[in-house]
Amino acid sequence: MLGRVLKSAARSQRGLRSFATTTNLGPFTEISTLSNGLTVATESQPHAQTATVGVWIDAGSRAETDKTNGTAHFLEHMAFKGTGRRSQHALELEVENIGAHLNAYTSREQTVYYAKSFSKDVPVAVDIISDILQNSKLESGAIERERDVILREQQEVDKQLEEVVFDHLHAVAFQGQPLGRTILGPKNNILSIQRDDLASYIQTNYTADRMVLVGTGGVDHQSLVKLAEKHFSSLPVSANPLALGRLSSERKPTFVGSEARIRDDELPTAHVAIAVEGVGWSSPDYFPMMVMQSIFGNWDRSLGASSLLSSRLSHIISSNSLANSFMSFSTSYSDTGLWGIYLVSENLMNLDDTLHFTLKEWTRMSIAPTEGEVERAKSQLKAGLLLSLDGTTAVAEDIGRQIVTSGKRMTPAQIENAVDAVSVDDIKRVAQKYLWDKDFALAAFGNIDGLKDYGRIRNDMSSMLY
């Protein structure tokens, strides 16, 4: 009897399979544009109980001058100090009452204000964000109090040697240009920025055509569009509006091969970053450069079995105790970038060897990258990119950043296909184009007396393998 039941069940399953269809249940990004140019983008998950909504603005420290450097970051601090409708206390209380998290950050090319809340409270979150963006009081007393807060933040940043090195790397790579400035700005600017500077930055940069309102998780696209029309329709438009992702007539930054060395023999380690000019977000070489960066990857001597990792550079450095750690990077901006490596070492007498073998591996990419390491790098890159899209806030970050920088959003499947399309020949091509015999920017901090001069390091950028 039991056998007949099992056979009947099997026949039933076979019947079901013959009628099965494949359905793409994955979320997709809906994009609309208001009459004033503000973009609304959503990736809805109807059954989600929480949502992230935020505004991504195509303006950061790059939109400042030498005199106003630090204004965008200062504004980020002032956003939570009260508006015409809400005092600081009322704003904080309203956010707490709905159990939301309100946050903001500034980068060199973007400013972001976002909130994570329950789905039912999305209208309140959008109202709060629109209020702080358009109606912040910018009171003189609050500005004066915030100076001390930002100066303390600057002191904390100065203690993070990686941050210090990368700020110097930008400063030498893009000398005298907006991308070379720090995000917080110099101390003198922090002490001198006035309300008029903040108001002028808002008027110039907080315009509808430079903003993307993003919603992810438990949000409905049409509902968010209506909220955008209600709260953002009065936003002005730039004097010379451009579609998001379109480069302005501003001249592309000039990459300068140069260096900055800050020697401090009291430190037990040397911190060195070296980079060539990279590519912008929309460059056709973006994904090949990302794969090449993934070939080198990251390494730390605390990792177990580090000498057995697939990266040849990891094996060389770990086997010879040349460094404590290294981190490869491919940093992109709208029209340029930095591609390189950041090393930390207490083997101070062998800094020359550390850089020599690193650049030797860079050189090898122009001549003989292997199929195996390229395929491994592609798998690692895909895993890293796709696994980073975990949670509504991470997805909102991805959507906002992509639309602001390129005017569109690549789906995870499209990203996967773009990475898969990278070949060994592509790696050779981009290595020859961006690495071989190119000038580099170098920033070094700490106990760096053993670091050889720029000219000798430069020779390794085109040395033969043998």
UniProtKB/Swiss-Prot annotation:
Binding site for Zn(2+): 73, 77, 153
GO-annotated molecular function: metal ion binding; metalloendopeptidase activity
Cofactor, how bound (note): Binds 1 zinc ion per subunit.
Reactions catalysed according to its record: Release of N-terminal transit peptides from precursor proteins imported into the mitochondrion, typically with Arg in position P2
Subcellular location: Mitochondrion matrix
Requisite cofactors: Zn(2+)
Keyword Cell inner membrane among UniProt keywords: no
InterPro entries according to UniProt: Metalloenz_LuxS/M16 (IPR011249), MPP/UQCRC_Complex (IPR050361), Pept_M16_N (IPR011765), Pept_M16_Zn_BS (IPR001431), Peptidase_M16_C (IPR007863)
EC number: 3.4.24.64
Catalytic residues in the record: 76 (proton acceptor)
Function comment: Catalytic subunit of the essential mitochondrial processing protease (MPP), which cleaves the mitochondrial sequence off newly imported precursors proteins. Preferentially, cleaves after an arginine at position P2.
Annotated family: Belongs to the peptidase M16 family.
Protein name, as recorded: Mitochondrial-processing peptidase subunit beta
Organism: Lentinula edodes
Gene this chain is encoded by: mppB
